């Protein structure tokens, strides 16, 4: 392999978010523990169909809304990640930058730079999410 090919491969490996994401979000998270109980009782798809937002390592997902996590960078001094996301809803596609923090073994908090429409409204993609043990993505 020539110098040019070696350099290209090295750049791709260095840019890969795999090492930053190896301890990233594990499992499925919902916005309340009650929703987790409902997902176990019914199905996760039922909750998605009613408009609830699901958090996983892939991103945020709902019936007509999703944010794909395209770049994940691990913080060195806290259990946090800086995440670049591409979000879409019917008729709109937009970027977002998120800070995601593992608050404890079952809670993740997200802060979004996306502005809100009204004061007091939840900030963009931000909020708390709770681990739903025993629940898998459909």
Regions found by a protein language model. Name each.
Residues 84-138:
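Beta-sheet ligand-binding and adhesion/scaffold domains
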Residues 1-7:
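Bacterial N-terminal signal peptides that target proteins for export
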Residues 26-28, 57-58, 76-85, 106-109:
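Short, hydrophobic/aromatic-rich segments at coil-to-beta transitions
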Residues 39-78:
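N-terminal glycine/threonine-rich, aromatic-flanked beta-hairpin/loop signature
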Residues 15-17:
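N-terminal signal peptide c-region/cleavage motif recognized by signal peptidases
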Residues 19-30, 55:
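N-terminal helix-cap/turn-to-beta initiation motif at the start of protein domains
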């Amino acid at each position: 392999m020539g110098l040019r090919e070696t350099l290209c491969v090295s750049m791709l490996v260095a840019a890969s978010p795999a090492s930053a994401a190896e301890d990233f979000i594990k499992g499925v998270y919902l916005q309340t523990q009650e929703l987790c109980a409902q997902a176990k009782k019914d199905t996760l798809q039922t909750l998605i169909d009613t408009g609830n937002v699901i958090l996983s390592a892939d991103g945020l997902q709902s019936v007509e809304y999703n944010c794909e996590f395209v770049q994940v960078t691990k913080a060195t001094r806290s259990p946090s990640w800086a995440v670049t996301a591409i979000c879409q809803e019917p008729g709109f596609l937009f970027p977002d930058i998120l800070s995601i923090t593992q608050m404890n073994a079952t809670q993740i908090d997200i802060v979004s730079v996306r502005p809100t429409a009204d004061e007091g409204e939840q900030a963009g993609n931000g909020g708390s999410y709770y681990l739903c043990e025993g629940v898998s993505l459909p």
